[in-house]
Amino acid sequence: DRICTGITSSNSPHVVKTATQGEVNVTGVIPLTTTPTKSHFANLKGTKTRGKLCPKCLNCTDLDVALGRPKCTGTIPSAKASILHEVKPVTSGCFPIMHDRTKXRQLPNLLRGYEHIRLSTHNVINAEKAPGGPYKIGTSGSCPNVTNGNGFFATMAWAVPKNDNNKTATNSLTVEVPYICTEGEDQITVWGFHSDNETQMVKLYGDSKPQKFTSSANGVTTHYVSQIGGFPNQAEDGGLPQSGRIVVDYMVQKSGKTGTITYQRGILLPQKVWCASGRSKVIKGSLPLIGEADCLHEKYGGLNKSKPYYTGEHAKAIGNCPIWVKTPLKLANGTKYRPPAKLLKER
């Protein structure tokens, strides 16, 4: 007689690594990992996702919106998640800006990090009557407004001495910038200065020497000295060629805190300010946003979570995302495999 044990005689294709026994053959496994493929970015399920700062502002970059370029002012939707689609925001098509002098390119990304963003309905200071005035408010043919007349950014007033009596060199002047947001938000105050060649500086301001500027708010102080001349004529968005340049900066004022700006000639005084609150999770990505996804991943775009873990490229992700692991994970759902038993001969 022959006696055989009741064990399957087929080989097991499943191998799992264990903490105590190394590689072990088992009769069944459940894969816990997936390797995503690149896809388009999407709206994050269960929350509002912001692409462009102002989706209804046509033909406007996010920097246009952040600076208040005429024809580029509109409502910025609230959002818990935001797509950083302009890693290095392009120039604003209104007036030539010296981007390398300041952190102006960071302004759209700063705003993107807030859940709620709105532009104040009135100006933070009366620019015409600011120290060193009276001033007339300068405009540019390169910056047409909604009626196609000359305009300028809504966030700044180009303060040009109004008459020959005050069109002279001046010592440093200081203006206080009050906090005007009404709901305890952070106040983002945009300001800057204009400089040109010596001839234009004398014509506009009565002084051709480099001018000094300082801003201070929330414990942060920034100093500038203007550059005179040396600029090639430059046009933005088909506007008129400009021999001058503007430098743009901003300061963040906390609730109830006053800021200060010390300046000489060529100042771009703050006007409308941004009032921003809450936090929006920001991730680098691309537009347009198509459909919905559980997770937004910088390398793979929109992902729907089919497994708890993933392999592949490790990068920042937001939402209900799988966890990155270096190697695939498996969950054993069968017994430890035993090789087929040998026939036993009767003694």
UniProtKB/Swiss-Prot annotation:
Residues glycosylated per entry: N25, N59, N145, N166, N304, N333
Assigned keywords, A-Z: Disulfide bond, Fusion of virus membrane with host endosomal membrane, Fusion of virus membrane with host membrane, Glycoprotein, Hemagglutinin, Host cell membrane, Host membrane, Host-virus interaction, Lipoprotein, Membrane, Palmitate, Transmembrane, Viral attachment to host cell, Viral envelope protein, Viral penetration into host cytoplasm, Virion, Virus entry into host cell
Keyword set includes Glycoprotein: yes
Signal peptide from the UniProt entry: none
UniProt-listed GO biological process terms: fusion of virus membrane with host endosome membrane; fusion of virus membrane with host plasma membrane; symbiont entry into host cell; virion attachment to host cell
Domain of life: Viruses
Main localization category: virion
Localisation: Virion membrane; Host apical cell membrane
Membrane topology: Single-pass type I membrane protein
GO molecular function, one term: host cell surface receptor binding
A cellular component annotation (GO) from this entry: virion membrane
UniProt-listed Pfam families: Hemagglutinin (PF00509)
PTM notes: In natural infection, inactive HA is matured into HA1 and HA2 outside the cell by one or more trypsin-like, arginine-specific endoprotease secreted by the bronchial epithelial cells. One identified protease that may be involved in this process is secreted in lungs by club cells. Palmitoylated.
InterPro entries listed in its UniProt record: Capsid_hemagglutn (IPR008980), Hemagglutn_HA1_a/b_dom_sf (IPR013828), Hemagglutn_influenz_A/B (IPR001364)
SUPFAM superfamilies reported in the protein's UniProt record: Viral protein domain
Record function comment: Binds to sialic acid-containing receptors on the cell surface, bringing about the attachment of the virus particle to the cell. Plays a major role in the determination of host range restriction and virulence. Class I viral fusion protein. Responsible for penetration of the virus into the cell cytoplasm by mediating the fusion of the membrane of the endocytosed virus particle with the endosomal membrane. Low pH in endosomes induce an irreversible conformational change in HA2, releasing the fusion hydrophobic peptide. Several trimers are required to form a competent fusion pore.
Note in the entry: Major glycoprotein, comprises over 80% of the envelope proteins present in virus particle.
Similarity section: Belongs to the influenza viruses hemagglutinin family.
Assembly and binders: Homotrimer of disulfide-linked HA1-HA2.
Protein name: Hemagglutinin
